[in-house]
Amino acid sequence: MVKLDATAYLDNLGCAHVVYFHDDSKKTKDTEFDFIKKGLEKQEHCFYTTQNPKEILHQMKEFGIDTEANSEFLHIIEIPEKFEDYSKMILEKVDELPHNSKIRVISTHYFDFNSETKTDRMAEIEQCVDDDFHKLNGNFVCSFAVNNITNEIRGRFLNQLLDSHRAIVFQTEKGGTEVFTLP
């Protein structure tokens, strides 16, 4: 594994379905928002899924993203609080992504992954996204706070996610950033 800047890595990766494991620290938001900001500077359509759109818009403004000037390219997608509702709508949202424009997606997953049923469903969703990824022109970053994944099923779930992604970013406030790509 190589240690480096996560945003630079994502920026140089090209089109890829990426899993981003993190500790939900300030560094996490800095990485996500910097990735979005760089896409907006290139006039790429940037999507951010969240359970709290107003708070994310506020945080983006504080980070230095001009959300009003970039409203044509910045798309904040509200996701349901309950995982069961989320799992139904996310695949529809993926189908709605522009296929001719360059895109960047940060898809946040702040659910409590505390059962194999939830992790199996999430792995199934990720595989569906990956199966249709060739239709997208850009990066799709699936952002997971590792502390929301129950210890007993964490290893199994992480392995399931590796099956449907081409690159992995591990980032913690203490440990920094490690990345690797999969064949």
What are these regions (language model features)?
Residues 1-183:
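Non-catalytic regulatory/interaction regions at protein termini and inter-domain linkers
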